[in-house]
Amino acid sequence: MITDRVSDYLEKIEKSDVNAFIDVNSEKVLKEAEELEKNDDLKNKPLYGKIVAVKSNINVKGYKISCASKTLEKYVGTYDATVVKKLRSQGALIVGMTNMDEFAGGSSGETSCYGPTKNPAALDRIPGGSSSGSAAAVAADLCDMAIGSDTGGSIRNPASHCGIVGFKPSYGVVSRQGLCDLAMSFDQIGPLTKNAEDALVLTNAIKGIDRSDSTSLETPKFEKKDISNYKVGVVKEFMDVTDEKIRNEIEKGIEVFKDMGCKIVDLSYKYIDLALPTYYLINYVEFFSATRKYDGRRYGEFIEEACGEEVLRRILIGKHISEQEFSGKYYKKALQARKSMKKEMLGLFNSADLIVGPTVPKLPHKLGEDLSPMEMYAYDVLTVPTNICGICSGVVRCGNISGVPVGLQIQGAPLEDEKVLSAMIEFEKNY
């Protein structure tokens, strides 16, 4: 019975101490489960009875959509985002809203006004961010699967740290309608799951064109493909910036592709040093623009007065470099760099079907450890190129270091999501 499974998960959530959830409405989800059991029209849908957690920056009617910020602490969603409507239409149940870095501005899960999320795979360490609660909920078996958002690695970073699967679809594959945006030209909604097969199913369920999002695209259903004859690229610069222990685990993962019949191709990406400055300059400007609606008049509090330190830092820098005298010096140059980075990245796919390598260059730090902003941003150096270039990218578990999970990142060209998801599935089977 679906209601029994929901009750089991609710009990686990109640007992859990990882702080994965911000808002859970037991009465609401149990009532929805009872109604679902009576709905014969949904019984053959691919997500029938699946219990899904949703990141707290995606609108779900009747739940707190706080973005883990005091700014929106009292805001309750008045509608379902397009992805949530799609989940429900496929037979899924929403169990609750997950913790996250405030306004998705972080890589650790520590900037939430509700306190940090713990990593279920290593309880004394960060789970990664910003989709910290979604990743932790899946890793701690508090739901079947979860939805997160990825602006510069916010699905893939915590998936790697928590030892689960995460997938960032190509830009436009999934509608962003109902997402509280961090940086609209980077943001993409995607799945966090216990295995790669589920990532394929969940991506198919939520993707598709949406009149409410002009950037959204229609794509054929993604199917599992044979990857045995694929050329798999390994970028030297991605490996060079990665800690040796992680690199060793990733090299073992690369051997798995070789054993599957793939040809390994050595590649070079000369713009790795531009990744963080390009990403963050554009991010700051777009985030500053996105937060102007939080003025304390229409809903919520005035953001500059209510937000945390990292969010305020991004707003103030974004405001500064948006000013006319600085725009040409910083923002326009970042846009030029983005164009060069994208051209170079897309060129790599002329030599390879996929690019594989590390997801994050270092292990997650211990909860409460004091890191400078630049040390924190360094977590993103291998994930932001995906968002800058609009390509797709997934993460699967690839070993561990003293029990702390390591994730292998698999990247594909724009709209080659099917290839990446297929490679994730085959890697998991053969690892």
Curated annotation (Swiss-Prot):
Keyword Amino-acid biosynthesis among UniProt keywords: no
InterPro entries reported for this sequence: Amidase, Amidase_CS, Amidase_dom, AS_sf, GatA
Gene3D superfamilies for this protein: Amidase signature (AS) domain
E.C. number(s) listed in UniProt: 6.3.5.7
SUPFAM superfamilies the UniProt entry points to: Amidase signature (AS) enzymes
Keywords from the UniProt entry: ATP-binding, Ligase, Nucleotide-binding, Protein biosynthesis
Reactions catalysed: L-glutamyl-tRNA(Gln) + L-glutamine + ATP + H2O = L-glutaminyl-tRNA(Gln) + L-glutamate + ADP + phosphate + H(+)
GO molecular function: ATP binding; glutaminyl-tRNA synthase (glutamine-hydrolyzing) activity
Gene Ontology CC terms, in alphabetical order: glutamyl-tRNA(Gln) amidotransferase complex
Any one biological process term the GO annotation gives: translation
Oligomer status and interactors: Heterotrimer of A, B and C subunits.
Described function: Allows the formation of correctly charged Gln-tRNA(Gln) through the transamidation of misacylated Glu-tRNA(Gln) in organisms which lack glutaminyl-tRNA synthetase. The reaction takes place in the presence of glutamine and ATP through an activated gamma-phospho-Glu-tRNA(Gln).
PANTHER family noted in UniProt: GLUTAMYL-TRNA(GLN) AMIDOTRANSFERASE SUBUNIT A, MITOCHONDRIAL, TRANSAMIDASE
NCBIfam families for this protein: gatA (TIGR00132)
Family: Belongs to the amidase family. GatA subfamily.
Protein name stated in the entry: Glutamyl-tRNA(Gln) amidotransferase subunit A
The species this protein was found in: Methanococcus maripaludis (strain C5 / ATCC BAA-1333)
